[in-house]
Every structure is written in C-alpha cells, then in structure tokens.
C-alpha cells in the first residue's frame, strides 16, 4: 500500500470510530451554563391571569384602578418550601458523627435548633432496608421524622450505597453483597496514598460492587420503589438526593484510578438507567443531583443534564474547589433550586484563623450567597452537635443572620391595586 493511501485509510477509520463513539456515548461535554438550552422549564397549571391590565382606551380591559395597599420588605427570617438553612442530623458516618452520650437528646436538640429551617439525614441502604421486601427504618430515623413533624420542619434525605466513613459495617445490605461481584479499588499514584488511606484501612470501602449486575439492578429498583411509596409527596420530605458515584457525594472515590465497570459505556448506561428509575418513581418530591465533575468516568455529566431537563434540582458538596461546579450552580436555570453543602469546622471558632478580618466561616457564608443557593448546610464536619453550631452563630451572628434572611428567594406582593368591574371587586398584585 502506498503511504498516501495508508494515511487516508487510517484517518477514515479514526473518523468513523469517533463518529461511532459519539453516537454511543451520551456524555455531555463541559459547557457554560448561562444561556444554555435546558428547555423552557416546568409548565405551571392553574395560574391566575398574568395580564396585561391596561385601563385606558382603546386597550382598556378594566375600569380605572387605584393602589389600595403597598408592602415593604421584612427583616424577619421567613421559613418556606424550597429554601433555608439545613441542620444536618447525620452525614458521612451516621450517628457516630453526633458527639453526645445521649443520641436521642442530641437529635432533639438539633431538630429544635432555631437556626435551621430544614433537616437532613444520610443513612445507608443497609440501615433502611437490611432485608429485601420492605423498608425498616432505624430508631434514630423514626425519631427524626417524629420530631420534624412536631417542630414543623421538613427533611432532606440521601441513601448511601457507599460510605467509607462507616467503619463498623458495609453500606450495602448483606442480601446484595452476597450475590453481587465486587471490584477492588486501586490508587492512582503514591501521592494519593495518604488521601486513600482511610478508605483502604476500612474493609468495607476497599471495593465497589458491580452496579450493572442484574441482581443489583433488581434490588435497586425494589429499593427505589419502596422509597417512593414512603416518601414521594410525603409532606415531611423536602427533597431526595439521587444515587451517584464518584469524586464528591456518593462514595468519595476520588483517590482511586479505577471504577467497577468494564468500560465507560457500561458505566454511563448503568447510571443513567438508575437515574431514570428514580425519575419514574419520584413525581412529586424534588430529586437533587450533585454537580461533581465526572472524575471516575461513569456518566455524571449526562445524569446532571437529565436532572435539569426534568426540572429537578442540583447540589454540591463544596464551595471552594472546582470552577466547573461554581459555573453550574451560579448560572443554573432560574427554576432549578440548588443546595450547597460546606461543613463548618468540627472545632470551636478560632479567632486566629481570620484573614484580613474575615473568618473562614464568614468567607464561606458570603460565597454561598454569591452563587444564589437555595439551601446551605448547618454541619460541623464529623462533629455534629447543636452546641457546636451555636458556638459559630454566637461568634458570627451577623453573617448567619444575613444568610438566613437572604438565602433562596424573597417574594412579596409589593403593589396591590383594586378595581370594580360590573359590580365585582378585583385585585391586581404586582
């Protein structure tokens, strides 16, 4: 074969392979979120007449109106759906993270904490479904829901399938582990050894299951169905986190070079199918998907895109690391709520840690507001207690009060007009 013919044929094969891969992969390349076409947003049913309401001929549709009332903004903290500071009851390591000799009392103190308007729990699959067939909530979760109802607060929920900080037991139930193959995790390089140490020393986090295995998928669908039957549309539930794999959020598998899948396409197909299962079951309660970059190459970009296009919500587990996440959070469509999880230190406030007069906590709060978050975590990292949270409020009350008033949305009827039309009294709200 002549060299020129060889080069032509090689290029043709490469182009064909690239086109084939493009058709097979659903991966969404990195993009700016501002003006990105995510669709027109959710349809709003039963809306009142949105106007216009001209009052002078020839366009008049109402008689002359008069302003009968105006309102002014309030400095009060107004709890509402879709916004607020979220008190973390459990996070990475279950009730072991609650620093108290009396867990029930500590849970009650956290629920009653006036600083938080919402609550959050993060149990493992094993904790809520140790056996197939039905949910069996542990006592601490039952207590959280009972106290939430008494204190007029709602609960956000994530169920973990991988929890490297649970050292006493695996996150998955035995009935799944016994029937699903597992793949050992491998460090990417020696520089990651220190970061991966806590995972490798825990026998329950040294591996990942073959999520694509038929038995795993069958058990997962049953779990999601049971969760939806219990929580979708439940007035106590504010939101549900989607199941994910990777850098942040579910698993924290970022020190490792491998994942449990044979190839990217299998990983992407598995996780997007699992997201679709959740979207099919949860029609009333919002689902939150993490904006984490796809470090582990499992299809996170497609999951995030489908989440936004289905008018569900997003979340992040950091504020100061990847610029990709800040881009997504800051420029998301206006109908998409965002939760920002950024833990406060587990130790008391340190006056010496301030930089140019700004403490780390105040800096964090300012940047959570900068991205326009709807929710922010009240969480002392791996040192959960109402006392720890209050120590930060007492040290920086102005910052906490400011975010409590500003987070989410503040909507009020500013102008109110009144008119009479054929004997009927009408109001226009603006």
What are the language-model segments listed below?
Residues 113, 121-188:
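Aromatic-lined substrate-binding rim segments of carbohydrate-active enzymes
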Residues 402-430:
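Surface beta-strand/loop "capping" patches
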Residues 379-406:
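A eukaryote-biased signal for short, well-structured alpha-helical docking elements
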Residues 119, 227, 240, 429:
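Conserved, mostly hydrophobic/aromatic
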Residues 125-135, 204-218, 260-265:
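The substrate-binding groove and active-site-proximal loops of carbohydrate-active enzymes
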Residues 163-226:
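Active-site-adjacent "subsite" loops/lids of carbohydrate-active enzymes
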Residues 5-26:
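N-terminal export signals
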Residues 37-107, 149-153, 239-389:
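Catalytic-core regions of glycoside hydrolase
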């Amino acid at each position: 074969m002549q060299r020129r013919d060889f080069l032509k044929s090689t290029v043709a094969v490469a182009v064909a392979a690239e086109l084939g891969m493009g058709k097979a992969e659903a991966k969404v390349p990195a993009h700016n979120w501002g003006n990105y076409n995510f669709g027109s947003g959710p349809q709003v049913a039963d809306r009142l007449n949105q106007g216009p309401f001209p009052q002078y001929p020839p366009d008049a549709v109402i008689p002359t109106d008069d302003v009968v009332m105006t309102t002014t903004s309030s400095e009060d903290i107004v709890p509402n759906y879709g916004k607020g500071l979220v008190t973390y009851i459990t996070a990475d390591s279950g009730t072991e993270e609650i620093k108290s000799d009396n867990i029930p009392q500590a849970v009650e103190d956290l629920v009653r904490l006036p600083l938080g308007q919402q609550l959050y729990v993060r149990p493992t699959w094993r904790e809520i479904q140790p056996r197939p067939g039905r949910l069996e909530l542990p006592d601490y979760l039952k207590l959280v829901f009972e106290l939430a109802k008494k204190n007029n607060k709602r609960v956000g929920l994530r169920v973990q399938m991988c929890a490297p900080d649970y050292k006493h037991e695996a996150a998955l139930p035995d009935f799944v582990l016994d029937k699903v193959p597992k793949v050992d995790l491998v460090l990417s390089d020696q520089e990651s050894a220190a970061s991966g140490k806590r995972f490798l020393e825990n026998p329950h986090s040294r591996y990942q299951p073959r999520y694509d295995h038929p038995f795993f998928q069958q058990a997962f669908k049953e779990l999601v169905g049971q969760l939806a039957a219990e929580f979708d549309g439940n007035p106590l539930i504010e939101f549900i986190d989607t199941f994910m794999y990777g850098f942040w959020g579910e698993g924290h598998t970022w020190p490792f070079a491998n994942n449990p899948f044979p190839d990217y396409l299998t990983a992407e197909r598995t996780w997007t199918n699992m997201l679709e299962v959740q979207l099919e079951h949860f029609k009333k309660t919002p689902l939150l998907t993490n904006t984490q970059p796809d470090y582990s190459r499992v299809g996170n970009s497609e999951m995030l895109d489908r989440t936004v296009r289905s008018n569900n919500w997003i979340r992040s587990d950091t504020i100061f690391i990847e610029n990709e996440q800040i881009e997504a959070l800051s420029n998301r469509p206006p109908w998409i709520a965002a939760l920002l999880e950024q833990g406060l230190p587990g130790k008391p406030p340190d006056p010496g840690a301030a930089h140019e007069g700004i403490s780390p906590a105040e800096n964090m709060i300012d940047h959570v507001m900068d991205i326009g978050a709807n929710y922010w975590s009240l969480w002392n990292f791996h040192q959960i207690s109402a006392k720890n949270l209050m120590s930060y409020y007492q040290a920086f009350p102005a910052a906490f009060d400011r975010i409590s008033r500003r987070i989410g949305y503040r909507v009020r009827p500013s102008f109110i007009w009144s008119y009479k039309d054929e004997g009927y009294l009408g109001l226009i709200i603006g």
